[in-house]
Amino acid sequence: ETVNTLKLRGSWGQLGNTSSNYNSFWDWYPFYQQQAISSASSNWLINGEKQNTSSLPSIVNATMTWETVETWDFGFDFGAFNNRLTGTFDWYSRTTKDMIGPAPILGSVLGTNAPKTNNCDMRTSGWELEIGWRDQINDFKYGVRFNLSDNRSKILTYPYDGEFSNQSIGGYYNGKYLNEIWGYESVGLASSKVEMDNWLTTNKPNWGSNWGAGDVMYKDLNGDGIVSSGANTLDDHGDLKRIGNATPRYRIGLNLDAAYKGFDFSIFFQGVLKRDWFF
């Protein structure tokens, strides 16, 4: 038989989640606060001695609760050629509701950081593929297994008081893919000071000085003659653009194994085919 096994799968599930960016006891139970006390830690002296100090705890958010994670998964398994060739494929969509995201910005008169809160939804979609071959030739057994996967996470909803276009490109906003990289576009390095001077007449950065040979020639994208970040908002980000994403894409793995008369050997490789890096 050419095809020995073919199985379709589908599943749905919903779980409470406490495994997020905030994993400590104090993050998940902010209503249990302690007033920190330190001995002889002050920066001032009274009668020639440092004084004991006490500090107030953070603001309490009594409404914070578990995140809700809902997952859909569809896939199939197959086996062929007497199950020497096997494989699986899965596509999934995981939605995290009431996720603990960055706290909303409050007025500086508050005097401290705003408490963490369940304020956004995020969806992670991806797929996983694995194909393997296992066979035997007389006393020699061998196997090969290859896997490939990919996923991306996107912010679905995030609260913002005001116009959507006024949100900062550095924070969460509706439709943002996690780990976006914003940066300036360049056309290369200046080969001479003359080339750089000519370039600066219509593409002058609003930072730095003494530009010359070997420096990066940044491109003015909005046509105002100045290379800048504008207001760093979705509506006015100057000459910044999405130049990449730091999320690892297309993770791969390769496993090889063999056995012959009591001796065995195995080796594996793993890596990432695409990832943007910034510094």
Regions found by a protein language model. Give the residues of each.
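Conserved small-residue
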Residues: 23-29, 117-120, 136-244, 277
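Solvent-exposed loop/turn elements at secondary-structure boundaries
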Residues: 2-67, 86, 90-122, 159
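Short helix/loop capping segments that flank catalytic or ligand/cofactor-binding pockets
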Residues: 19-20, 182, 266-268, 275-277
